Amino acid sequence: MEKELEEYKSQLALVQISLQKTPQNEELQLLENDLKELISLTENLLQESVENDKNTFQNSQNGVAGFNTSKPVHIDFTPGNLVMARWVSGDYLFYPSRITAVSGFGANKKYTVQFLDYPDIETVSLKHIKAMPEEKRQEIEGNKEILKKSTTIRSTPVREPTKAISVASMSTSPSNYASRASSPDMKSSAAVTANVSPIQNVAQHVSTLPKISPIPPSNPPPVPSVSYSQKQQKQLKPKAALEASQNSWKQFAARGVKTGRVGKRKKIGESSIFKSTEDFPGRTNPKNFGNVARSGHREKHIYNYREDEDS
């Protein structure tokens, strides 16, 4: 905006200089009026923007001061406190639990919590823990049975539940597990398996099952044995086929071809133009076509100029 204002002012100065030379020019007069209006509008906009910036700066200062005055509240949790802990390995929601142990120092503290609705234990950081509402805390403290579940550890052997637990039901949330444990079918087994997770129940149930070893067949099929002669025959089969085809062609060529009903058989290649003679020096080439090789040979002609002079 400031650069535009400077440009408008410089243009107005040029127009005023030209008007001094030609004061009766109407176009320059109109241009001068337009530039003056533009300059006034831009100045008003600049003033408004400066005022807005001041207000925002003051508001931000007030906000920062107010923020600094309110100090963040840090709650130091200790073992035995009732809190709302997040089920990190499950549905990532908060459930009522009790802190059993604290490890680490400062921001790296780790809290070992035991959920009240189900007996699994997890180790989480401070960001996964929040204070429990006062009403809910008083309600849980008044109910002694819930507190006993999280503090007592039974050494009696675990009894199998009356109904089989499916694998899909083990991956449900703690609230679903609590509702299932409160059903009439599971009440008798919940008191015994209060501190044992469903995964441990299934593992113990599988360990009690009898181990079944595979029964070998009474009459196993005989292993096919390949002798050396069979291998040799397989390797010689292609060679034998090739030799048989060669022999059949040789027999056909030796037998010859009949020219007529009573005619003599002619061997294949007997009347061929490419057939070489039976003599030892016989050879085949495009010039003699099977004639006997001659002893003479063609020499290169050399021109003799003296023969021309004598003539």
UniProtKB/Swiss-Prot annotation:
Q: Which UniProt keywords apply?
A: mRNA processing, mRNA splicing, Nucleus, Phosphoprotein, Spliceosome
Highest taxon in the source lineage: Eukaryota
Q: Identify residues that carry Phosphoserine.
A: 173
SUPFAM superfamilies given in the database record: Tudor/PWWP/MBT
Presence of keyword Phosphoprotein: yes
Q: Does the keyword Phosphoprotein belong to this entry? A: yes
One Pfam assignment? Tudor_3
GO biological process terms on file: spliceosomal tri-snRNP complex assembly
Record field: compositional bias (Basic and acidic residues)? 301-311
InterPro entries assigned: Crb2_Tudor, Tudor
Which stretches does the entry tag as region Disordered? 154-183, 276-311
TM segment ranges:
none
List, as start-end ranges, the regions of compositional bias called Polar residues: 168-183
Q: Where in the cell is it found?
A: Nucleus
A GO CC term attached to the entry: spliceosomal complex
Question: Where in this chain does the record put each Tudor domain?
Answer: 76-139
Question: What family is it from?
Answer: Belongs to the SMN family.
What quaternary structure, including any partners, is listed in this protein's UniProt entry?
Associates with spliceosomes.
- Protein role: Involved in spliceosome assembly.
Q: Domain text from the record?
A: The Tudor domain mediates association with dimethylarginines, which are common in snRNP proteins.
Protein name stated in the entry: Splicing factor spf30
> What gene codes for this chain?
spf30
